[in-house]
Design a protein with these regions (language model features):
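Bacterial N-terminal signal peptides that target proteins for export
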Residues: 2-15
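Extracellular/secretory pathway and lumenal proteins
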Residues: 18, 50-51, 158-161
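N-terminal signal peptide c-region/cleavage motif recognized by signal peptidases
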Residues: 24-26
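N-terminal secretory signal peptides
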Residues: 31-91
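Long, charged/polar, surface-exposed segments that mediate recognition or autoinhibition
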Residues: 77-136
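A charged, solvent-exposed segment within the mature domains of Sec-exported extracytoplasmic proteins
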Residues: 119-175
Length: 175
């Protein structure tokens, strides 16, 4: 087995630099985690506790920093990700300025196609909750599918829990 110390100094430095470039290139082109469907998919279907810090940390580790912070949410590009057989291009997680805690995703399919994919994979059915030209679809656990230009957006939003109210101080009479 050949060691770096047995190579000429210049060759050792070049080999070290080349291996560093391979490692940094691999870090940039991260694969979608195998847990993506379980973690993000169940979160979008409101089948799990909705905690924005948990989803933010998960997406940060899996896809790197959010590419934008807009509309009370951090937006992450999720190249190569699929949920229910449908490509998902972005996932958004609420920040602490929103009155809701939410996780959402932009799917590369119409709401009708996304709904059919979820029914086929999970068996969860959605009901149209309005009669507009672009109806909102809602499932029992509160997951919603809405139009997002030519694509669809699916999200789970819950009210942010308020801190417990402290009872007023009890006045005591001094003796």
């Amino acid at each position: 087995m050949m060691m770096f110390s047995s190579l000429p100094r210049r060759a050792g430095v070049c080999a070290l630099a080349a291996s560093a470039m391979l490692v940094s290139g691999a870090a940039l082109a991260q694969a979608v985690p195998t847990t993506f469907g379980t973690v993000i998919g169940n979160g979008l279907l409101c089948r799990d506790q909705t905690a924005n810090f948990y989803y933010y940390d998960y997406l940060l580790k899996a896809f790197g920093p959010a590419y934008k912070h807009d509309g009370g949410a951090f937006w992450f590009k999720t190249e190569g990700a699929n949920l229910w057989g449908t490509p998902v291009s972005e996932v958004m997680v609420s920040d602490d300025t929103s009155t809701y805690i939410f996780v959402g995703a932009a799917a590369e399919a119409t709401p009708e196609e996304l709904e059919k994919a979820i029914i086929a994979q999970v068996g969860l059915h959605y009901a149209r909750i309005d009669t507009s030209a672009f109806p909102v679809r809602e499932a029992k656990p509160a997951s919603r599918i809405v139009y997002f230009d030519t694509k669809s957006k699916i999200y789970c939003a819950k009210y942010k829990p308020l801190p417990p109210v402290q009872p007023p101080a009890v006045r005591q009479r001094l003796k």
